[in-house]
Amino acid sequence: MKKMLTLFTAFCLLAVLLPALQSGAAAAPQAKLAVYVDKDNHSFIPLRFLNGFAGIQSVLTASGGQIQMSRGGNSITFTPGKPGASVNGKPVSNNMRPFSENGTTYVPLSLVSQTLGIQLQWNKEAGSLTLTSGADTGTAVTATLPVQNGTLIKSSSPAVVSGHHTYRVGGRSFSVQTVTVSLLHPSVKLDAVLAGNTVGKTEALASIAKRSNAAAAINGTFFNAYTDGAFKTPYGYIISGGKMLKNSSGDKRTVFAYDSNLLAELIPGSEFKARFDAGSVHGALQAGPRLLVNGKVALNVAAEGFKDPKILTGGGSRSALGITRDHKLILLTSGGATIPQLAQIMKQAGAYQAMNLDGGASSGLYYNGKYLTTPGRLISNALVVQTK
């Protein structure tokens, strides 16, 4: 009888603890869905992405003994941690071993794409890979994933770091504050947040950051800061969680946009609406002008529709963001720079793509609970960085 009670007690404890353990495991951040290219130039793709893409069925057996995938009558089987594979039941040569990291299983991309009929387009400048299936049947399914080179980002590595730098441009020194965000870090999220969660309101940058549980934040789009009215119109597209908070049809200014994997890019304003309608944009802010294209200064301020002398010729407090080739986001503030000088600063800071944000008294940068650059007024919206 005593033994039965002990077993019953143990069962009850297990019933209580197991959901909690499962909940804790579920709460751990998963790796972003990204193609991984190792130091030997071998490419791997997350099994989690493949499952369901273009009708692919993928299974990691309960014992972890085999990885099985199938599509359109073709099948492929891997053994985790071991070379070799089986295609349609026949052994094939394969030197790349499936592996798991950060809770994600990766499988060799080349053999999977060849066997299951997936076309690959490597986008060097964007650091991404576009996968297409079914193009020959008129039912094409397409997805684009970031490409991570060298080593996978560990969840224990820093996700967001700050810095203070001095850059020389044209014989003049500029002191800048930066926050660098590892976009492919498992814990990182971005969001575009409205002041007061309402179009037309204003709020302190620190207040927006704190109520968003943000590790970092920078001011966002231009807005009508000088009206006497309570409603201060933001200018440009604002997208959050895939929803359009502020439309700006016809606006040609540059848009910073990112998808659900935080694959970030800068898009001309004239092209943005079509991209948003395609369903790939998870978040976005429109400001401009564009500063860098593929690592080179590329200013076309008038073509983006700017007429204000503060942008065309003047200097002042500046905010900007940049994207590096290895999927880092640079948030930067500087004082007294013209737009051409800001472009040079962003290049020296390591950005490959870059654009200007609202500046002047709006310019502000927040990190780790305090201001690195304090804005001189309330702002309309902000780009915030969250770590789960």
List each language-model region with its residue ranges:
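Short acidic-glycine loop/turn motifs at beta-strand connectors
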Residues: S182-H185, A225-Y226, A257-L263, N294, ...
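Conserved, well-ordered active-site substructure
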Residues: T137-T139, D228-S249, F306-L357, S362-K388
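Sec-dependent N-terminal signal peptides of Gram-positive bacterial secreted proteins and lipoproteins
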Residues: K2-A27
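Signal peptide-directed extracytoplasmic domains
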Residues: S70-G72, I76-P91
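Extracytoplasmic Gram-positive cell-surface binding/anchoring modules and repeats
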Residues: A28-G65, P91-S128
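Active-site-adjacent helix-turn-beta-strand microarchitecture at beta-sheet edges
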Residues: N224-V297, V301-A302
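N-terminal post-signal-peptidase region of extra-cytosolic proteins
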Residues: A34-V35, S63-I67, N94-R97, G163, ...
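Zymogen propeptides
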Residues: L21-A26, F53, Q57-V59, E101, ...
